[in-house]
């Protein structure tokens, strides 16, 4: 991963430590299949939705979950590490572990009208 990020020395060690923060790291990969009815982009959206649903299910089961992405997710070196086929794309990683003992504060509610529109 450090190679994919172009890091060396202490920066590479810092990245390696971050990758070991969670006891379980799941790679989220889309493997699109040729289909006249379901284009590649839609297959990627479905894979993302499945990963999100998995993160919600893990959270509901009491696990802490964080979806991580970054420039490394699309790097050739990372694709080699994950042994992805030429048509496969890494969408990111789900870091799974224990939840913090307590949440700090309460989230500020958002105003849905600031983010949604109607046709």
Where in the sequence are the language-model features?
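Generic beta-strand structural signal
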Residues: 22-24, 61, 90-92
């Amino acid at each position: 991963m450090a190679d994919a990020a172009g890091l060396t020395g202490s920066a590479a060690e810092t990245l390696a430590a971050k990758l070991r923060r969670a006891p379980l790291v799941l790679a989220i990969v889309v493997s699109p299949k040729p289909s006249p009815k379901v284009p590649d982009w839609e297959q990627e959206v479905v894979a993302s939705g499945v990963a999100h649903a998995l993160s919600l299910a893990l959270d509901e089961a009491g696990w802490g979950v964080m979806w991580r992405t970054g420039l490394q997710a699309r790097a050739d070196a990372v694709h080699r590490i994950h042994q992805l086929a030429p048509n496969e794309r890494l969408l990111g990683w789900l870091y799974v572990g224990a939840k913090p003992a307590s949440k700090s504060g309460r989230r500020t509610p958002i105003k849905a009208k600031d983010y949604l529109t109607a046709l």
